[in-house]
Amino acid sequence: MSDGGRIRCVRTLDWCEPLEVAAGLAMRDGAICLLSDPALPGSRSFVAADPEWAVTLDEAEGGPFAGLTERDLSAGLIGLASYDAGARVATGPRPAVWPDLMMARYSAMLVFDHDAGEVRVIGWGQDASAANAACDLGETWMTAATSPGAPPPPAPALIPDADDSAYLDAVGEVVARIRAGDLFQANIARGWTAVLDPQADPFDVFVRLAQGGAAPYGAFWRLGDRALVSNSPELFLTLDAASRRVVTRPIKGTRPRDPDPVQDAANAADLLASAKDRAENLMIVDLMRNDLSRVCEAGSVRVENLFAPETLPTVHHLVSTVSGRLALEHGVADLVLASFPPGSITGAPKHQAMKVIAAHEPPRGPWCGSLFLLDEDANLTASVLIRTASFERVEGRWHVRTQAGAGIVADSDPAQELAETEVKIGALRRALTG
C-alpha cells in the first residue's frame, strides 16, 4: 500500500462545492465523484477525471484481483468489483452483464474536507516536475466548476423485470428452503430497467439523487460507454494503511421514514425492538467476523457495536461494526477477496446463499458489488453498491438497470419483504422518473 513508487505533490485550495466541480468534469472520460454526506463527522469527498490508466477485467481466474500487485493497488486508485465476480465460486459461470473488475488510477485528485472547509489537490508523478504538473491539472478542474442546476427527470418510466407475484413466490420458496435447513438467510432482489431520454445523461441521475438527500457513500463514475450512480449508505470495508486497522459496518434491518414525526419515531422504535431484524443482523455480523478472521491477526477481530440505529433521508437502518487488524502477510487484495461479496447482501452461509440467489435472480452486475478508493495515503474505503444504478450506452442511448433486495429469514412475510424493496428503490425511482 503506497504511492506506487511516485512522488506526491499537495496544495491547499479555497473551498468549492464538490458537486459543482464534478459538474464541470462530468462529461470527461473517467470522471469520478465520491460524494459524502457533509453532516457526518470526518466526511470527505473526492473528484477526479482523466485517469493515467484504466483497465477492465473479465472472469479473471483466481478472482477479480488475480495478477494484480500491491504496486497496482496504490494511492489514487478507484475500482469497481462486480457482485458476480465474487459469487462465481458458488454459482459457476453465468452470462456476463458487467466486467468483473474496472479500475483506474489518477495522477491527480481533489480531496474535499467538509469539516475543515478546504480542498486539497493531490498530484502524483515519477518525479517532482511530473507531480507538480499533476497538481496543476487538478487546479484547472477547480476553475471548471459550474452549477449542476436542477435536471428534469431523465427517464419516462422505471420498468420492473417481473410483476409483484414473481417476487412473492421467490420469497416464499426461499423461506421454505430456510425452514427445511438449507440455509439461514438470503438476500433476494428485484430488478428494474429504464432508458434515459435522448438528451439525458447518468450524471443527471446523480445530481437528482444528491439533491434529494446526501448519503455516506454517494458516487458517480464514467468509464467509456459505462457509468455508475450510487447513493449507498453502507460501508463494506475500510483499511488504515498505517495501523492496518480494518472496519466493516454491515446493515441489516430497515424501516421507512415517515413525514409525521410521531410515526417516524414509532417506525424507528419498531426496528430497534424487532427480534427478527436483530437476528438477521447478528447472522451477518458473525459471517463478517469469520471473513475478516481469515486475513486478520489472531484474536484481533471484535464486534465494536451491535444494532446501532442509523437514520437516513428515506429509511431507518440497524448497523453493526466489526473491526480487526490486517495480518502483515496480507494486502488490500487479500482483504477484499476474503470478504467479497459483502455478507449483508448475500446471506448465511454465504456460499449456499449465493447459490440460492442465483436460482431466483439474473446476474447482478455491479449491484451489490463494491466501489473502492485508495486515497492519498493509500487508505482503503469500499462501499457496498446498494441503492445503485448501472448504465450502458447502446446506439447513443443510456440503458439503466437497478435492483433492490431484502434479507429473507425463516419468519419472513413475503408481502412485507416486497414492501421493503419498494422503500429501498424509492430514492432512485424519484431520481430517474420524478
Predicted stretch roles:
Residues 1-434:
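Extended alpha-helical targeting/anchoring segments
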